[in-house]
């Protein structure tokens, strides 16, 4: 159900509270998922004119789970705070004295419900942390992370239900990784969606038993960051080592991700340097180039009255990854009607060369390769 459809069914006096939750409500570490509501119902009599829904189920993303709490207002007394039912978390009993926004409920503030939900989620986090005391190993993992503010202040924990047969329970740690994405080139962060939310990397680590014999890590990137780093398949994190600890493993993942970000930033600046060098060396031979991301360059060149194009595609992780050179005849066509071309990656190249050296080496390579390309174009293409 879309937020607009849901809000149209809410009692008008309660609508500002719910609107603030579904339109602006982001609680916890997962900034890519908003709060949402379902199961709208009314406690009013059938004679009450609509819209009159005053109770609903609130879905809250937390530590890779979705908490489903019932929130019950009274449309007849909209100035009163709501009641809460915590669904399957029957053992969760929040401390009323710590719910300041509930105790001093201000119906004139449209964000008062959202503020109460945030306080409840904080208490729910404390409740889940307390459950780890049943396992000395999981408690050790939690306490060592807590001692590091960069991890301890950005962590959510969910302890699963205890197995009645074995007495074991699983647990999941969700951490917001302290990785700086601010210097990623802006062109890479475009066109993902209209409201991308916060740029964030979340590491989920699931312990399937209390002795950490089965541990499954997974990295989640917000859409813009995933796109900027080359897609979901571009980053593979290491398996959790047998006998390892989170306090050792999490920095490894941070280091890996930081290096990946630096590769992308370095690639952008190196591509710009590369294209600037080609503009200098080839001058009017440059037909076009990508002036935003510096990922493409096209040259129109001549060798002994034979004109040809060279399309240069620079990869995201340039200069580590070698550019592709595609030679294209301006005279000859393939059977499908396309200009005859050949792609080349087997040419002199070193990622250690600067842009000027790459341009000089490319010019020398063009002179040696063009004769055989011309011969192939005449042999395989049609005028």
Swiss-Prot record:
Coiled-coil regions listed: none
Keywords: Acetylation, Apoptosis, Cell cycle, Cell division, Chromatin regulator, Cytoplasm, DNA damage, DNA repair, Mitosis, Nucleus, Phosphoprotein, Repeat, Ubl conjugation pathway
Compartments, as annotated in UniProt: Cytoplasm; Nucleus
Region span, UEV-like 2: 275-364
Entry keyword annotation includes Cytoplasm: yes
Matching Pfam families: BRE
Complex formation: Component of the ARISC complex, at least composed of UIMC1/RAP80, ABRAXAS1, BRCC3/BRCC36, BABAM2 and BABAM1/NBA1. Component of the BRCA1-A complex, at least composed of BRCA1, BARD1, UIMC1/RAP80, ABRAXAS1, BRCC3/BRCC36, BABAM2 and BABAM1/NBA1. In the BRCA1-A complex, interacts directly with ABRAXAS1, BRCC3/BRCC36 and BABAM1/NBA1. Binds polyubiquitin. Component of the BRISC complex, at least composed of ABRAXAS2, BRCC3/BRCC36, BABAM2 and BABAM1/NBA1. Identified in a complex with SHMT2 and the other subunits of the BRISC complex.
Gene Ontology cellular component list: BRCA1-A complex; BRISC complex; cytoplasm; nucleus
In-chain residues carrying the UniProt-annotated modification N-acetylmethionine: 1
Taxonomic lineage from the root: Eukaryota, Metazoa, Chordata, Craniata, Vertebrata
Protein name per its UniProtKB record: BRISC and BRCA1-A complex member 2
Domain of life: Eukaryota
Gene Ontology annotations of biological process type: apoptotic process; cell division; chromatin organization; double-strand break repair; mitotic G2 DNA damage checkpoint signaling; positive regulation of DNA repair; response to ionizing radiation
Family note: Belongs to the BABAM2 family.
Phosphoserine modified-residue sites: 2
Principal location listed in the UniProt entry: cytoplasm
InterPro entries assigned: BRE
Record note on domains: Contains 2 ubiquitin-conjugating enzyme family-like (UEV-like) regions. These regions lack the critical Cys residues required for ubiquitination but retain the ability to bind ubiquitin.
Function: Component of the BRCA1-A complex, a complex that specifically recognizes 'Lys-63'-linked ubiquitinated histones H2A and H2AX at DNA lesions sites, leading to target the BRCA1-BARD1 heterodimer to sites of DNA damage at double-strand breaks (DSBs). The BRCA1-A complex also possesses deubiquitinase activity that specifically removes 'Lys-63'-linked ubiquitin on histones H2A and H2AX.
Region (UEV-like 1) location: 30-147
GO terms of molecular function: polyubiquitin modification-dependent protein binding
